[in-house]
Amino acid sequence: MRTAERGVRSRARSLVVFLGVSVLAGALAAGLAIPFAGFAGFATQKAAVSMQNLPQDLETAPLAVRSKMLAADGTWIATLYEQNRVPVPLDQISPIMRRAIVAIEDSRFYEHGALDAQGTLRALIRNRSEGSVQQGGSSITQQYVKMSLIEKADTAEQRKAATAVTYERKLTELRYAVAIEKQFSKDQILEKYLNLANFGDGAFGVQTAAQHYFGVSAAKLTLPQAAMLAGLVKNPTGYDPTNNLKRAKDRRDLVIARMRELNLITAKQAADARKAPVIDFKKIRKVPNGCANSRYPFYCEYAVAKLLDNPALGSTPKEREHYLKTGGLTIRTSLDPRIQAAAQASIKEHAKVSDTAIAAITVVEPGSGLVKGMVQSKPYGKGRNHTYYNLNVEKSYPGGYGGFQNGSTMKAFTIAAAIQQGLPLTYRINSPAQIDLSGRRFKTCSGSTRDPNYRPRNSTRSGNLTMIEAAKASTNTYFLQLSQRTGLCSIATIAANLGMYNAQTQEPLDQVVSMTLGVGYVTPLMLSNAYATFAARGKYCRPTVVTSVQDKSGKPVQTPGIGCRQVLTPAVADGVNRVLSAVMEPGGTGGRLNFGNWDLAGKTGTIQDNLAVWYAGYTPNLAAAAVVADATLPYTNLMYGHTLDGQDISDPTGSGTAGPLWQTAMEKALQGMPLRRFVPPNSKITGGDGKSLPPVSGMSPGEATDTLSRAGYQVVLSGDRVNSPEAEGTVAYTDPRTGDRPPPGSQVTLFLSNGQN
């Protein structure tokens, strides 16, 4: 008897609550003040105050939409997302899908307002009998509000409040739901709901869910497919068919039964739908997320790093990353799949994943700085023979390795400094096999520097050489003397203007006596882009990987884009191009790397003790730098004993080891491109504009020095005596020779006779 009385009292209380909620809904819809004081038993005073303080409209967070990164030709590179979602308008969602979700979640959706009074009464009676909230009874609009509040939550406390099983939360949702119903039509609300909902297994929104589970668009969903998806929304994890196929089928069949009960489908349609398989596991499509799943992971990560530096995407790196993964951005990059494939084919031909040495190549377009390709021999990943290091970029970028000493490729900047100062390509310096530079002062930007014990040697040609001859042979003693003549500050300034700096520290390259021999750490990206400046006749363009960004509505997002400036005069660059072209002529260190009818220029680079070898070269169309190196920190292992292409490296050189990588990549990359030519240097660059050197043969050293000094030249006395018909101790000849036209300020070396003809 008492039990029956309790049941009657419970049902009575539920009825009172129902009436209260109905009054509440009406009052909210009318915008009236709520007399909460008389509503005890249904909600606490705290809930009442909360309701009174809520804003009129729900501020929803922008819908998280996945972003895509594309190559220059529009092909896919990567998808970036926090939630895998592609929103679609309601007319691109099949009618059967719309009916299925309404049937199972809110069958009277188009008949009631923000509150479904019948559903709420049913839930309240259940909850009162259980003593806690057990059944939702929420309308689709209320569910949309709840999902929006969860989506908007930034903190754990906000997420907890958005999912709390309390009447206070229900009242909050109801207040917002009333505002939503005033602001949007039923179809608009349903569209928002279906695009926001979580459909399990990482699929957000009905379009992504349809593609994920069935490989079709939301517009093509069939009855059994729609029923399965509609059943997921209540519990995306519990009813996920990839986790529990039986539960997913039971839930799908329940949706089908409900649709039949509401006469939305026929009995035959229901029976046929129940017979259909829930999913075909072979058709499930996982959308790869992030750069790790990209075809070009290293390039992708570098592009993302550049995007995270862009303030147009947010005030902080964290905000930018969030926008990058939720903003539905279309990111177009400079990567050219054809050129990337050419560089990758070269790596495959000349290196193996299992090699103990590493190989890397970057290809850049002169005149734009567009990074067209970036490859390396070690694939992306963990474990044996894999790496997360990007061997082509600076250490300041996530995963950046930080470069390698670049050896004689640095001589190109010394050449540029010499030409800029008026030294012609015919400028001669006596360049012995070994030279003693101990204690010699070299001018720097802050004063001078010297090495107390420095006696460098040549590994190739020595003698009285012109700039072109010395470049062809990569004669160390020539370029060390040339760098003393130009001063290290000039070389450092030109290198910095061409984008060169220490890739380990981001500091300027050290101005040391051996600077021209390439002792600073640089990257293939840095070096290829610097050489591209020569190809572009002195126009430097910062390396660019992201060419444009559009938001989800197609509006452009500001990006740095291409940025170029003239850092060398075209005449100086033309001179550098002529000198480095000679390197690739017969007899030059790069002569074996010549191909086709292209105008080619380049420079070898071999690090002392063979820690790394380089070849950097270019045409007017493309510039590339290839490196082969030991990649074991802290860069102390020699190349000897390492393997490349499965073979032991016995004689590592820039031309013989790194050169073939460069040659194959460039030859393939240039296929189909227009043939362009370097501009020949003018006569002033080639031969100088100075007066003929006055004859001083037969003069005493003092007399010759006075004569040449008055003519504007710097005079150096060689310590070597040479065979000559001139009297012993007098001048036998000079370097440059009598009749040459070195520019004013040039160094002239006096060679004295030993008196032996």
Question: Which residue ranges define each predicted feature?
Answer:
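Short pre-catalytic segments that frame enzyme active sites
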Residues: 77-86, 208, 212, 237-241, ...
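Peptidoglycan glycan-strand catalytic modules in the bacterial/periplasmic cell-wall system
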Residues: 63-266, 320, 379, 472-476, ...
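Conserved catalytic neighborhood of penicillin-recognizing serine enzymes
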Residues: 129-154, 286-292, 423-491, 540, ...
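Extracytoplasmic/periplasmic proteins that interact with beta-lactams or build/remodel peptidoglycan
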Residues: 56-66, 135-143, 148-173, 217, ...
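N-terminal type II signal-anchor transmembrane helix
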Residues: 1-68
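A penicillin-recognizing enzyme superfamily signal
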Residues: 329, 333-353, 361, 374-377, ...
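Ligand-recognition elements built from short beta-strands and adjacent flexible loops
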Residues: 597, 668-757
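Bacterial peptidoglycan biogenesis and beta-lactam-recognition machinery
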Residues: 93, 103-116, 130-134, 180-186, ...
